Design a protein with these regions (language model features):
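Short, basic phosphate-binding NTP loop
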Residues: 1-85, 211, 284-285, 293-309
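Walker A (P-loop) phosphate-binding motif
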Residues: 71-114
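Residue-level signal for inorganic ion chemistry
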Residues: 19, 48, 86, 114, ...
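Active-site beta-alpha connecting loops in nucleotide-dependent enzymes
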Residues: 4-15, 29, 227-296, 317-331, ...
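Flexible active-site lid/hinge loop adjacent to a nucleotide/diphosphate
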Residues: 126-186, 322-328
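Nucleotide phosphate-binding/pyrophosphate-handling subdomain across enzymes
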Residues: 18, 109, 185-269
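Short glycine-rich anion-binding loops that position phosphate/pyrophosphate groups of nucleotides
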Residues: 52-55, 91, 136-138, 157-158, ...
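Conserved substrate/cofactor phosphate-moiety recognition/catalytic segment
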Residues: 109-125
Length: 344
């Protein structure tokens, strides 16, 4: 009897490698790929391997028909490393990345999960620790919590299109607190001591791109900002980063995920809005000096035309929407356009 892989993104492709290694026959179903829709009835498969992002109703429906596996459940069952789960609305990737850098000084470590490195590719690869960035989608579908250490960094409204309410999202995130040991600590050095029992010092922790990344003395690329909580964090930190000088905010993205909620911004001297969702954003943001542009190049040309140097914070506060595939593409494009407009 065949198994079925439901969803063919990063996790789905890792399921494929996993099943091939075990000589298990499978079909693939992906709602967004027409050629991967012609399959047998779902209840005719022995097992179904589900990607985390599929809607909850579909996941529960599949569970009523078959044995359903997620990548985190398989990893819990088969991998022998010490497992550290890190979740939160914001800064989970950065915290996981920094903690893994500290751990790898003395130990072998996997940095896996929602950060973009599939768990199934690292089962029993000899690493002593696994630092796992875990999303609310993964926590929601997780059968049971088998993290040795669980970290909940923060919670603010997010992914309400999936969860339906903030309370549901919050309850899902709090499942991480059912780990053997749990913490709300965000300092990677304190987390390292909590996990290993030892102190460590490393002055030069590397950072991930597009997370409040200072690409020049006067420009910050915070493309990873995809919600209001992360935008507020960036605005607060920009004040110190720009040494209390004026700065402009550049924003774009789709505000539907934030339910088109209104926000009053006081920190920036100007708010410059661009992209296909610009009119919606303009209605959501309350600020005395806000301007609309068709594209990013127009924004940067406008800033270049100013007589004085401009401090620029690019922190969209919304998902990419129709403008970019993801925050990585958005961040990369911002850097390219800065280079083109300011340095050509």
């Amino acid at each position: 009897m065949k198994s079925l892989i439901y969803g063919y993104g990063l996790t789905g492709k890792s399921f494929e490698r996993y099943l091939k290694a075990k000589n298990i026959e499978y079909d693939i179903f992906d709602d967004g790929t027409p050629e991967l829709k012609n399959i047998q009835p779902f209840d005719s498969y022995e097992n179904i391997y589900c990607s985390p992002g599929i809607p909850r109703k579909i996941f529960n429906s599949l569970k009523s028909l078959n044995t359903v596996y997620t990548d985190i459940d398989i990893f819990f069952k088969e991998d022998k490393s010490i497992k550290i789960g890190i979740t939160g609305t914001n800064r989970k990737s950065t915290t996981a990345f920094h903690l893994s850098q500290l751990i790898e000084i003395k130990y072998s470590v996997n940095l896996i999960g929602n950060i973009g490195e599939p768990m199934l590719d690292h089962i029993n690869n000899g690493s002593q620790y696994s630092v796992i960035e875990i999303s609310s989608y993964q926590l929601d579908k997780m059968t049971e919590n088998k993290f040795d250490f669980g970290v909940l960094l923060n919670i603010a409204p997010d992914h309400l299109d999936y969860h339906g309410s903030f309370q549901d999202y919050k309850s899902t995130k709090e499942k991480i607190l059912e780990s053997v040991r749990s913490s709300n600590e965000s300092d990677p050095y304190k987390l390292y001591k909590w996990v290993t029992g030892f102190d460590i010092q490393l002055s030069n922790l590397k950072s991930l791109p597009y997370r409040f990344e200072k690409i020049s003395e006067s420009i910050i690329n915070d493309s990873k900002s995809t919600n209001m909580h992360s935008l507020k964090y960036a605005l607060k930190n920009a004040i110190g980063c720009f040494k209390d000088e004026h700065f402009v905010l550049v924003t774009c993205g789709n505000p539907s995920k934030e339910k088109f909620s209104k926000i009053t911004l006081e920190e920036p001297s100007e708010v410059l809005i661009y992209g296909s969702h610009k009119n919606d954003i303009h209605k959501c943001i309350n600020h005395p000096n806000k301007l609309i542009f068709d594209n990013l190049e127009e924004v940067l040309i406008y800033l270049k035309s100013k007589s004085s140097k401009q401090n620029i914070l690019f922190s969209p506060g919304y998902p990419s929407g129709n403008d970019y595939k993801n925050f990585e593409e958005r961040g990369s494009f911002f850097n390219l356009m800065v280079e083109k407009v300011f340095h050509d």
